[in-house]
Amino acid sequence: MPDQIPQELAENLQAFKTSEAIDLYSAYLLHPEEKRLFAEYYRPGESLLDIACGLGRTTLLLHEMGLVVRGIDASEVFINTASRRLPYLDLRVGSYDHIEEPDASFSHVLISCNGIDYAFPEPQRVAALRECARVLKPGGTLIYSSHNLKSLHFFSPRYRSRLIWKLRNSLQAFKDRAYVLETGLHTLYTSRQFVIAQTEQAGLQFRDLLWLRMIGNDRIDRYFSPYIHYVFTKPLNP
């Protein structure tokens, strides 16, 4: 992990040191979309790097599925707490934009719970995606979720009144991305076109996406899903 953490990212990390944050991330359950994707793409014995693993929610459950999992998180408080609760898991303090692992060392990389969206400022996110591509084996997958800027869910007056938008210009919010300052966290909201283009520029290929099941119909859910799960693969011949 680099000695100097950018001030903006350091501010985000402070939000993950509180007792409230520990309580919030203490539910050890998989979401329906995670169950579906994990069943489709993961197999026992495969190696997986769980980035921004928090208190080890997905790390534990993937370990129980038979994967060889290593979890890293920038929050030392989270890792220490998780290590006391789950001493048999491989949990380490680590940054998603400077992963201390060899090239092509994991079959899969996972960033759950929109964890990539807290990489702030944006160059941290770009660096994180490049690092994910670097540590993936050829043919390996990166699965992550990102807040859906185009969701009608976020355009309700009740929801918008709780947000302080940090925009370079207003048009940007309606095109591809916008940073939001909410409950002390700088959070990136994105369009799916932006996510796919940015991740492919990091060296990965788009494979699939999964909407949050709000209604149960993909044609409708895409307009109301507050976040989207994405699947990317590392080319066999870069």
Task: Describe the residue ranges of each PLM region.
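Conserved class I S-adenosyl-L-methionine
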Residues: 1-43, 45-54, 143-168, 225
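Class I SAM-dependent methyltransferase SAM/SAH-binding core
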Residues: 55-98
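A short acidic, Gly/Pro-enriched loop at the edge of an enzyme's catalytic core
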Residues: 97-109
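A short SAM/SAH-binding and catalytic strip from SAM-dependent methyltransferases
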Residues: 108-123
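A short glycine-rich, Lys/Arg-flanked "PGG" loop and its adjoining helix->strand segment in the class I
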Residues: 126-138
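Short alpha-helix
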Residues: 186-203
